[in-house]
Amino acid sequence: MAESVYKIIELVGTSTESWEKAAAVAVERAGGTLRDLRIAEVEKLDLHVENGKVMQYRAKIKLSFKYEEAD
């Protein structure tokens, strides 16, 4: 088996629908520019509240992807 290295970044996704959607938004957006995504770990869930109402669900995630050196 070949040796591999993975980079881990932190992202915050937001949604007006749910925490699950917020996490998915973060992963999907990252997938638009990063390749070989591997594992997303939810670090923190919180809410943006205004006037006693939930405005946004927020999910802070750690996302790993395979590190490849430039040629």
Locations of regions flagged by a protein language model:
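Basic/polar N-terminal segments that are highly enriched at the extreme N-terminus
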Residues: 1-2, 71
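Short, well-ordered alpha-helical segments
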Residues: 4-37
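Short, conserved loop-to-beta-strand elements that form functional interface hotspots
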Residues: 40-48
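Flexible glycine-/small-residue-rich
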Residues: 13-15, 44, 61, 65-67
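C-terminal structural segments of small proteins and small subunits
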Residues: 51-71
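Short connector loops at helix/strand junctions that flank enzyme active sites
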Residues: 6, 37-40, 54-60
